[in-house]
Amino acid sequence: MTRHFLLAAALLCSACLPAFAHEAGIHAEPSDAVPAAMDIIETSVGIAGDMAVFSTRVRGSAGAETPAATGNFAGAGVYAYVWPTGLNSSDVGFEADQGIVALAVTFHPDFDDAANGGANRDVWHPHWVVLAEDAACNGGLKVVDIAEGTAPKVPATWPKVPLLIDSPDYATDLSGDTVKVTLPIALVGGLVNAAYDGVTAGLRINADLHAPLLCVDDVFKIASGDHSLPGKVSTAQ
């Protein structure tokens, strides 16, 4: 798997500060240049029993920063806490080798993208996304588009949008300074010993509503500071 996501993100990152990583997580120095709610100071992915826990701790209150509502889908903003991983897209229900697999906790007040037509625009919620390079995006990356007339393999909770995105109903909690997602490890192949990093980012729907439909627009912070997915999923002893 390439490191294109983190390499491109680094070009926009306002605070790629030194960090250190081990099996307990990736730790980063705080930065006043980053909004406190997006200023990652620690991120981790661990396994306890039959559950996996993705966690990010920030300098401020998790979830306190959200994009302004515009009332329109075109050009709508998305804020996200993201864990880019070394997983293959086939590990989360898509065709193999489609791009960079990331778990993201997102907020977007102008549209819903829950599974089965559900509403989620007013809450932070999780997605699996597959990312790829695209020079048309300000951040150099997009959520992979599904071309018209094609029918690739998608997970059962795909929200029926033309993107490689999944909307699983994982337990998601934003409390104090921490964002946490808990999911059954049986649902994700290859997670044990997988590499990961932590990123906070803004994305945006294309104002023209054509591909690339959803672009990485801005990056607030990369936990590792060196764009190398240095984290390794830990297992409780």
Give residue spans per PLM region:
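Bacterial N-terminal signal peptides that target proteins for export
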Residues: 1-6
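Bacterial N-terminal signal peptides
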Residues: 8-16
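Sec/Tat signal peptide C-region and signal peptidase I cleavage site
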Residues: 17-21
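Extracellular/secreted glycoprotein ectodomains characterized by long, lumenal stretches
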Residues: 22, 41, 65-74, 191-201
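Short N-terminal segments immediately surrounding and downstream of signal-peptide cleavage
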Residues: 22-39
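Surface-exposed, glycine/proline- and aromatic-rich loop segments on solvent-exposed faces
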Residues: 34-132
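Acidic/polar low-complexity flexible segments
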Residues: 83-89, 192-237
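Short helix-loop boundary/capping segments
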Residues: 134-184
